């Protein structure tokens, strides 16, 4: 959660930090603040968005060449001016910004109060900075050393940046469990939660590892471990274009990202599959081919939209490769003492590569000897570095909090994995494999065609924007799509929505259906088509309003449904890549019509880096 930005160099820090906070606002937008060195250590902060902070400091002296900023997703303490970051220590000599949660903050706070420290906020972060100050005062050490020693005392997750009014040329930072990247420019340095605030100024970055301490002083960068061992920075080159994090003329990032899917799906398979030459290859799979081919089972761990992509993968891998698959919520998997062995492969799916629960699940699986495979979108992310092997989705930056292109990119990569494993295990006939390859190559063009439904979906959205409940139904490969469609709607429009396997409707949800209940049914031509036609008739018999997503040319369901959305025909195995498109557009347009903040829905953040 939370976004942090810092700068030290020859430029004015404030504009750089504010622009960076705007680019990180998808990580949290309850409150925002900056700290600047300009004749002292001065903090300016406000409840609300970065724009509220900008308005507050418009008449303030914000000159200075070293500064840091924070945009918050509240954990400890409600969103208000006092709980906003940065936080001073008791003496106001040092200040901190913090992304994460300090689990033992209560006991530390009580100890510090007994020592005479005072607190203004309800946050765990203020405890952290007072602990650092207490160590510095009592150990008579440097600030960098005090920060290092404090890391041994705190339990939890953190990415922090610390400033001191006694040193106008020093930034200190550290991380454990929350992302942190350092940008290296010409005589200047940038720190941020991810690379989006940095790429405008430099493409050279260092991804900081857990338990590492960063000291930037007098134009020099030094990285040490928590045990005080000096590390050699590994400088990587960013391959991200500035325009990829701009709206590009769209009213919202979410709509832009929905319409980017033909490209992001193509990029996710680019170089990995060429149907014409029967070429299929994925580096991470090739490296561990024997383990995958001989796996007793594959366990997929993920959260939210990535979990839905994992459910699609369960159908794909079991059908095409005949390997048992279990799909687990990472947040539950890590706490239930799962049975794992060296014959198991654990696949972690995460857009950001920083999801705290998924990372913890990986560490658990690794401790049991399982092979760990990661699927994520962000190069250099924690999951990418923690896994034995993996695959990037190449969807490009996704700024909208509600994932869209991340889902289809993940399903694309998972489809490739299922096809490769089916081929290697001999469970997928060559003829069928070639058919699937040709069909997958045609998906970007078919997504383009599905996006042409936008105007029709605007009209449907107008009729249902005031609904209070939605039901989404699907069978087989479309059941996870029903779950994803319901999640998208409730995430950004705040309408209660539930996704169900269509056959389960009779086991409870049918009691909810009346003339006021919109029911979205994904009813494409597949092996369960006749069954879902029956489910639609059951809904209509109870006066439910049917919005049906059907295969182009269907004549049966249009005679029963109130609204029909036709998508191009494709293989049953790949239909989620098309059937999800209208549901994304439906949720988007309903949210816009209800006046909701589509890109920054309430109470949510893009990257869930805390438990």
Regions found by a protein language model. Give the residues of each.
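Conserved short alpha-helical segments that host acidic/polar catalytic motifs at enzyme active sites
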Residues: 1-247, 251, 260-296, 335, ...
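Glycine-rich oxoanion-binding loops at beta->alpha junctions
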Residues: 65, 69-82, 276-289, 313-349, ...
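Structural motif
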Residues: 66, 94, 297-299, 345, ...
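Acidic/histidine-rich
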Residues: 154-188, 460, 465-491, 526, ...
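Glycine-rich, anion-gripping cofactor-binding loops and their flanking helix/strand elements
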Residues: 181-206, 331-365, 504-540, 570-584, ...
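Generic C-terminus detector
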Residues: 228, 545, 558-560, 570-611
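Active-site phosphate/pyrophosphate-binding segments
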Residues: 261-265, 269-299, 389-518, 591-611
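Glycine-rich phosphate-binding loops that contact phosphosugars or nucleotide phosphates
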Residues: 293-434, 439-442, 522-563, 586
